[in-house]
């Protein structure tokens, strides 16, 4: 019985952690990325624009992570969108959010 409750509590913890993680990605997007990606500033692919994201997504997640983390030469996209205080994990979570919205 004890192992049953441990399993239940672990599952609840994962659900809560996932919800918190998603909210954090959304908040990070709003505070650090939306200024360019909501309006398409300097040809930034807009959030949810499937046509704009399709060729980028074909390059794979690693390429998108690299662009977000290190910047993309020849574009306005600088490393971490200019927010050097963001952790790599935070940036990757926002990339994952943006990919999900473009599917």
Where do the model's predicted regions map?
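Bacterial N-terminal signal peptides that target proteins for export
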Residues: 1-8
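Hydrophobic helical h-region of N-terminal Sec-dependent signal peptides
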Residues: 9-14
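N-terminal signal peptide c-region/cleavage motif recognized by signal peptidases
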Residues: 17-20
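Short sequence/structural segments immediately N-terminal
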Residues: 26-30, 102
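The canonical Cys-X-X-Cys-His
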Residues: 32-39, 94, 98
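Gly/Gly-Pro-rich "capping" loops immediately C-terminal to redox-active cysteine motifs
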Residues: 38-66
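Axial heme c-ligation environment in periplasmic c-type cytochrome domains
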Residues: 45-46, 66-93, 98-102
């Amino acid at each position: 019985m004890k192992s049953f409750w441990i399993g239940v509590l672990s599952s609840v913890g994962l659900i809560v952690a996932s919800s918190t993680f998603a909210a954090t990605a959304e908040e990070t997007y709003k505070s650090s990325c939306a200024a360019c990606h909501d309006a398409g500033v300097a040809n930034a692919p807009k959030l949810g624009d499937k046509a704009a994201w399709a060729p980028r997504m074909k390059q794979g997640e690693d390429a998108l992570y690299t662009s977000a983390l290190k910047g993309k030469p020849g574009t306005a996209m600088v490393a971490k969108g200019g927010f050097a205080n963001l952790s790599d994990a935070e940036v990757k979570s926002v990339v994952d959010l943006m990919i999900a919205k473009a599917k």
